[in-house]
């Protein structure tokens, strides 16, 4: 049975190529992260550490490490924050830090408001404007 599994994977080089491409993409975007998230993803992407190894180092459960890595992977490969980065000249500095907090770090409205010293209303208003901008730029680059 094990031989069949190995043979099946050997016949799917496109899956290996897709995984390699995804890891290269993540590697190229590690600089967008900061703090613990950057360390976590560096251990995973650059060092090839397993969830179990990272969990032992951090003193947390393997599940929480896996969950955070999957969240960060999704956010790093999602186009919303990158669209903001590519068009940062059209967004204010405040909008850029709020976009980073929301789309990349995954902070809640309340957490962003506390971190940035503004009201939740102000954060909600800025995020609505950022999302509108993202929709507009998406429709320009990908017209239906």
Question: Language model features by range: what are they?
Answer:
Residues 1-52:
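DNA-contacting interfaces and partner/effector-binding or oligomerization modules
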Residues 34-47, 91-107:
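Short amphipathic alpha helix immediately N-terminal
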Residues 53-58, 111-118:
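Short alpha-helical "recognition helix" segments of helix-turn-helix
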Residues 74-87, 131-144:
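Short, Lys/Arg-enriched C-terminal cap helix and immediately downstream tail that follows
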């Amino acid at each position: 049975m094990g031989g069949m599994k190995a043979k099946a994977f050997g016949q799917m080089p496109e899956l290996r190529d897709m995984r390699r491409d995804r890891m290269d993409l993540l590697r190229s975007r590690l600089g967008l992260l900061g703090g613990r998230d950057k360390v976590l993803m560096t251990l995973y992407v650059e060092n090839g550490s397993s969830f179990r190894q990272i969990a032992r180092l951090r003193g947390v459960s393997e599940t929480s490490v896996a969950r955070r890595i999957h969240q960060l992977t999704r956010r790093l490969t999602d186009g919303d924050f990158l669209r903001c980065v590519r068009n940062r000249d059209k967004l204010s500095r405040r909008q850029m830090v709020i976009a980073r907090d929301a789309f990349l770090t995954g902070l809640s409205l309340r957490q962003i408001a506390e971190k940035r010293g503004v009201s939740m209303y102000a954060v909600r208003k800025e995020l609505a404007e950022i999302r509108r901008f993202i929709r507009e730029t998406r429709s320009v680059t990908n017209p239906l």
